[in-house]
Amino acid sequence: MEDIVARFETYAELCRAVQRKAIELENHPERKKRLRRFAAAEVAEILGISPGYLRSLVHEPDFPSGAIGPGGRRSFALSEIHAARAWLFAHTGNPRYAPRRRPEAGEKLQVVTFVNFKGGSGKTTTAVHFAQYLALRGYRVLLVDLDPQASATALFGLDPESEVRDATFASWLDRSRDARALVRPTHWDGLDLVPASIALQHAEYDLVGRLLERRDFPFYAQLAELLAELEAAYDVVVCDCRPDVGMLTLNALWAATGLVVPVPPSMLDFASSGEFFRFLAEVARDFRGSIARDALAFDFVRIVTTRFKASDRNQAEIVRWKRALFRDAVLAEAMVDTALVDAAGILKETLYEYEPAGNRRTYERGLEAVRRVDRALERELLRVWGRPVEA
């Protein structure tokens, strides 16, 4: 009889090998993830200035000049974009060039939790794109991967088995690691990661065991305590949850200031989301009755339509129903279902990282759809901080 344990271990290693090879091929010869450079037109859009103004600024003292590539095209690293934004603020005083939160003005750390009952909702894709968008915009971002499948972690080029192991949120539960020791820098300047691995599955059991041993154990507040140790270093924390309602998800809900629920436009997902919101109501009722009267008092809750095909009339009808029922809780913008996301995913990349070999116009349309969703979510942060919100 074949050893089923050995078979599954072999399958797991084959999957990891494919991930490693994809990263190595795309990033040869470094064999680790690196971020592409950004064209001058992209940089102008990111900074909110005209391309002509950017061309004039590169000749100013201390302004990042970027690098000249084939055809005389100028490009910039993300760190140079951050430096350009700082230069603009120093020379204009315009607060739009100083996006970091201002604790002295009462701007608290925003913890945005992406969560849903159901796998396949596009949750991780939406969460990681949002985290990268915020980094492009100049915020200090921490992405916390709470899913033992570690899909978000893999997108940043880490092998959960060999490079992460137990250095996850799970290690915080017994305080065997300092909070800062769990944070990994990524190839995105301004974006750090608390990675995931299968060790998080054991964290679920650990939290249940501690609660059985001590009924007053604050099992729900462990992530909030971790983030309290790291708060001064970040403006926004993005949490990618596992697709269930276990102990880790409860921690992410307790720590959250904002909630994003990705929902594909299908009746099955619509029904599943109804059960999810019923669960949230029960959790809020229990927490408020036994722990704190203001538990789960989110600054915002938004439903994001994911995997949307505008040409599909059935999907369009479901989206209309959602907006009629949930009104402003549903973002007007949607994460479109595009083959480009799959193409980028093969290389363990997002659309912000991807450099298409084919139709550039198709890529730009897909990227702009993602940007619209991310801008809409950024506006929620600005509202909470009491800042002006651009349309």
Region annotations inferred by a language model:
Residues 1-42, 46, 51-52, 56-391:
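P-loop NTP-binding core
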